[in-house]
Amino acid sequence: LFLKDTFSIAELVIYSIALAVGVIPEAMPLVTTFSLSLGAQKLAKKKVIVKRLSAIEDLGGIQILCTDKTGTITENRLSVVNVFSPNKEETLLYGLMAASSLNGEGTSNNSFDLAIMNAMGSKAKSVVNKIKKINQIPFNPSRRRNSVLIESSYGREIIVRGATEAVLPFTENQYGEDSELARWIVAEGELGRRVIAIAKKRFSKDTYNVSDEESKLVFVGAISFEDPIKSTTKRAIQKARELGVTTKIITGDSAEVAVAVGMKIGIAENTGEVITGEMLFSLLKNEQKEVVKKLNVFARVSPEQKHNLIKLLQEDYEVGFLGEGINDGPALKAAGVSIVVDNASDVSREVADIILLKHDLKVIVDGIEQGRKIFINVTNYVKATLASNFGNFYAMAFVTLIIDYLPMLPIQILLVNLLSDFPMLSIATDNVDRKNILNPKSYDIKELIYLTTILGLVSTVFDFAMFRVFSSYGERTLHTYWFMGSILTELMLIYSIRTKEWFFKIKTLPSKAMLLLTVLASFLTVYIPFTTFGAEVFKFTYPTRDKLLIIFFIVVGYFASTEFVKRIWYRFMNDAH
């Protein structure tokens, strides 16, 4: 145009800037932030606090969800079920005296302590009053036991309590695999019950160390505990499976207990579908990958092994990990999405992306679903805005070269941008068809570029059609009807890209915000050219019925063509995959 001396440099610069503003999806950061904020608000109502907004979208992309079983899969409400001992009362008594977290008032926050206290009833508090705790070595995941040095009416004793394999090897009597105790432990474990062993030792000194608790212990008894599966767990795991997410249990419990729970909730089919952390990491790297892909239950996993297991999974999958202990920090950092419960350690809460106020697997699965909806809506916004903007840009840039006037004035381009942007923003609120969220999603930039380019070319074809029809009527007529056609075709595209199926087959209705804003934008698009304001400020001509009818048929033709091209594209992509 400048070369033809049709316009000054200033006019050309203003037009170019307006055209550039029209083609750039400047609202994308706003749409993304708004979508994520909306998702965070919805999750907050379900007792999920999002620390990192983008974690919601990441949550939607996870393929594997790793969790401990206690408190998430189960109720974390232990009850004593069985006692292996000739003297049940003595075993419970020593089990309670070994409670390292028991305070002077006879209360504790340890679920094992609470279960034993409930089993003992009113006797529990009198036990606490009769003992004097002198020293203790707390429980830790590597030892899998704790011990206390107490003074009571029995004298001064070390009492050791913990996992059976962490206590029994240090007792005076050795219990082999064929012993009655060993068979009892296996039987209880196969029922999903957690078993702890209790042993004691006379001791005269005021202080002791680990070596003192590792010899000449006298076996007192073993207690089995039941932790009921949450009523929501099986449905949550089934829903996760429907979303293409595999749930894996990583626990410090025995293999028997872990796989029994796994079988109850449907992630393991038989007792052989479990492996311990030690067994897993004794394998070669390629064997480890095969095992973690195949199995969903991992038992006797130490904090270090848990970290290595998450890293191993993260190499091939998007992983979400739910942890809570102080030792879970490294594993939480290794996971793509780190999730903790509200009473987790400070270290775990610090590195977490998401905090659960409700200890329930269901809320995590709800979060995955919400993340996928956000991903779909953000992707739909990108498709709609790039396809329509590029389509208009191609057409205007080309037409500008062959006519002696601007196909649309800069102020008209900005009005197109304004009226189409608000409905585009409403995509963030749209309802997503359930069929579209059934698999983990990730951005495919190549597909986005190809699809938006193809849809942009469809838009360009219909822009040329409008130019061909209305350019013969003069400059203002072309401006007016191209303005109308540009906005109305963009609005129709919003509804087309909502689904990969035919538009009329989608069962989920658009959001109220989308319906309201598209109807309002459509009304203003048609109404403004009829007004004096439209004529004076935007230089529109008064529309006529016959030309409005032409615009109507062009818009309908555009929508039908877009639907047809879209279906061919997705069918081609499905065949390619």
Model-derived regions: residue spans:
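Membrane-interface segments at loop-to-transmembrane junctions
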Residues: S16-A20, K51-L59, K373-A384, L414, ...
